[in-house]
Amino acid sequence: NIQALKNDLRKTKELLQSEKEKTHTVQAMIEECRDKQRQAEQERDYAEFLKEEKDWLQDYCLFMAIKNEQKGICWIDWPEELKNRHSKAVKEAEKELAEEIEFYRFQQYCFTTQWRKLKAYANKKGISIIGDVPIYVALDSSDAWANPEMLQFDEDYDPKAVAGCPPDAFSATGQLWGNPLYDWKALKKDGYGWWVQRMTHCLELYDVVRIDHFRGFDEYYAIPYGDKTAERGKWEEGPGMDLFHTLDKKIKDLRVIAEDLGFLTESVLEMLKESGYPGMKVLQFAFDGSEDSSYLPYKYDHNCVVYTGTHDNETTKGWLENLQGHDLKFVREYINCYEQPVNDCVWALIRTALSSVADLAVIPIQDYLCLGNEARMNAPSTLGDNWKWRLTANQISETTLYHMREVTRIYGRLAKASEEKETDEIANAEEEERQDNDQNSKIVE
């Protein structure tokens, strides 16, 4: 009997081992099918991506591949046939650099896929993303190389003039940006097609677009190409509202913030008003030596966006630490912080922005954290440590989060979803308390 039991046990083990191997085989087959399915889905996604982004993707990838082959030099210094996009030279480059072109395509696909997931996650959490879009393209860019007809180039594809700003109290020789200028007549003849494509694409990446140098659509400053300063530039007429009427017709739900900082003419103010786009108000600009600045909060209307400071400003703490004399005295008077520490003044300015009538308030995270200029994002017209500051996971404490949320709630700026969640949480807490009270009453009885 014992031997029979041993035999049965051995057979059972063999059977179990066989079943286990079968299970492993089935699992391996299932995993292989899943891998093939994922690969097929990715291939379909990739093909769809190439189709969706065809307006710019091929030109960009070809440009990058050629630029890499040309050791990174600006395209206006490429061999003539490539610089001028001769058909034969372009076809040869596409053939010879096919592998590198495919690398840049797939790189853009990976980024776009990841970005879309990130944006979808943010939107699901009730967070909208504002994208910052410069008015001009860079000279050394695929946009300029692939679309020379929309820019002010001569017959050799060199710029006739470049962008910048005239001399003022801050710069005796002005600002020489060096971007090629648009040929607005040519763009209008094409129905502003490139701008329609650009803004459509931007609004796929972002929920709201902030257009830099909005006044440049009314008048733009043109500096002769090759000049070392901006002193010989002159103002030229831009497209004005004609461009924005076209964009409004072609693009559904066009959400724009107009960067309208600096000196503005009456025609620029009229264009901003007619467009209906909100302009910008920067609190740091309100305390500039006078007590009558248009950036003071009591002068705002609803249709604007208030910032304590932008990426181009000092942090609010750094700005306060560098402020002196009358301006420092006035800002402390304005926010009712006469002797308080600088961090208290930072929070008072945050409250000033949030309590204003501006429809939208933007507070840099550096200000919520009361960081100094070691955390400044960008110092315009300088080289060095710009755009290197990073927020780390351990910098935001639960206490800071609580204060951020409370000050947002107090001034009625909580997102609707957050308000509803808070209301539900309060209602649930009240219901739990009522049930506890009922239970206690029964116990007493």
Where are these regions (language model features)?
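Structured C-terminal cap/extension of enzyme domains
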Residues: 370-421, 445
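Compositionally biased non-globular segments, especially hydrophobic aliphatic-rich helices
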Residues: 7, 15, 26, 426, ...
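Intrinsically disordered, low-complexity terminal tails and inter-domain linkers enriched
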Residues: 420-444
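Alpha-amylase-like alpha-glycosidases and glucanotransferases acting on alpha-linked glucans and related
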Residues: 17, 21-109, 137-362, 366-373, ...
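Conserved, well-ordered alpha-helix/loop/beta-strand core segments that scaffold catalytic motifs
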Residues: 104, 108-137
